[in-house]
Amino acid sequence: MLTRNFTSLLVFLLAGVAPLRGQDQSASVVSPSTIATDRPAVTNSSVVVPAGSLQLENGFLETDSQGQSIIDGPETLVRFGVASRTELRFTAPDYYQNLNSTGGLGSGFSDFTVGVKEQLGPTRGGFDVSAILFLSFPTGAHTVSSGGYDGGAQVPWSRSLTAKWTAAGMFSLYWPTQGRTRNVTGQSTFELDRQLTGPWDVFVEYAGSFPERGGPQHLLHFGTALKLAKRHQLDFHVGVGLSSAAADHFIGVGYSFLFQGFRR
């Protein structure tokens, strides 16, 4: 029932915003001179990178979960703008290192992922909306890889509330391989972002994942991002689990940069 509800919601959102693509689009096209990243929030950016741009988002994360301590990096997401409202996305294999000597998740590289993102907004109500589809390939170490071809769909959105406050969120549906079966998982997020100064903002975020098998995973997430220049960004974030199935806590840092030099 939960999976059907998430699927219906995704279809409804995509169907509802698709007819609005031609309305007031210029208002929310990303400025070609300013970086706008997916990280460090769970909620992805609701806009694409500018056409001809290459953006790399990187970071390191330390996670404590059910007695296991794991670090991973470099969390590299490559985003390439192929059209004014379309980007290609490549998630490089991430290396996981289990700091515990007994049991738990093994160490090694994760799977490679390819995706595409299409900007659908802004809508008449002032919402920016995008749709993301992706597929992972079982290229990682057997101790880390799912061993399957895993797909997913995400619909991030955002809306400015005032000159300094923005609300955002994302509805997602994933089909991860666990063992020999799929554990279809719905996820929803809600984020409030506050711009402290022109280049510096902070956020608080809730993220909930709801798998068909296993308990729900509720997270409370805090973070900040500082633009060192228009095309360079540092970030820092921490999160705590609110349910027994979620990670106990995690902490991460990141650095992202934008190349704006490709012309057609």
Label each region the model flagged.
Residues 1-5:
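Positively charged n-region of N-terminal signal peptides that target proteins for export
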